[in-house]
């Protein structure tokens, strides 16, 4: 290419020695023929063994017991929050809904919320749209608050 010509896309090519063909094995004696890197005679020369095969030994997946029971697809998993955390987030108390907890980053909006009774409170909470354990309910009501699940 002359110095005054403009370099164009169709003129580009890889540098010499930059591209090397992959070795094609088993294509004749002159180029890795015969055993083609598979070693001498035997099972793995002729074919492959399936995943989990242990050479005829009783495989692990058959030695272990079968799984029993079932998983309930309708199980409800609650996000839990303790009274101590509620007091941290809302020190003044007042009405607390699930949306307020989501806004503060305490829970996510993908599962229902349950309040547990770890911690103490002296401020009154009015909790809306959450479940509460018996101990949490008694502590909140003792402080002058209330819990409603709707």
From Swiss-Prot:
GO MF terms held by the record: rRNA binding; structural constituent of ribosome
GO BP annotations, alphabetical order: translation
Region Disordered: start-end pairs: 1-55
Annotated Basic and acidic residues bias: 8-32
This protein's UniProt keywords: Ribonucleoprotein, Ribosomal protein, RNA-binding, rRNA-binding
Pfam family, one: Ribosomal_L27A
GO cellular component: cytosolic large ribosomal subunit
Family membership: Belongs to the universal ribosomal protein uL15 family.
Function: Binds to the 23S rRNA.
UniProt subunit comment: Part of the 50S ribosomal subunit.
Name this polypeptide is given: Large ribosomal subunit protein uL15
């Amino acid at each position: 290419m002359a110095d005054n010509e403009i370099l164009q896309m169709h003129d580009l090519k890889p540098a010499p020695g930059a591209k090397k063909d992959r070795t094609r094995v088993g294509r004749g004696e002159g180029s890795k023929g015969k055993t083609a890197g598979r070693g001498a005679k035997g099972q793995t020369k002729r074919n492959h063994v399936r995943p989990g095969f242990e050479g005829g030994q009783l495989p692990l997946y058959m030695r272990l017991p079968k799984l029993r029971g079932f998983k309930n697809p309708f199980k409800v998993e609650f996000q839990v929050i303790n009274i101590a955390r509620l007091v941290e987030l809302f020190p003044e108390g007042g009405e607390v809904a699930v949306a307020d907890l989501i806004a503060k980053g305490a829970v996510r909006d993908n599962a229902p919320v349950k309040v547990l009774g770890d911690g103490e409170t002296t401020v009154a909470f009015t909790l809306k749209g959450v479940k509460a354990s018996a101990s949490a309910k008694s502590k909140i009501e003792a402080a002058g608050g209330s819990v409603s699940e709707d």
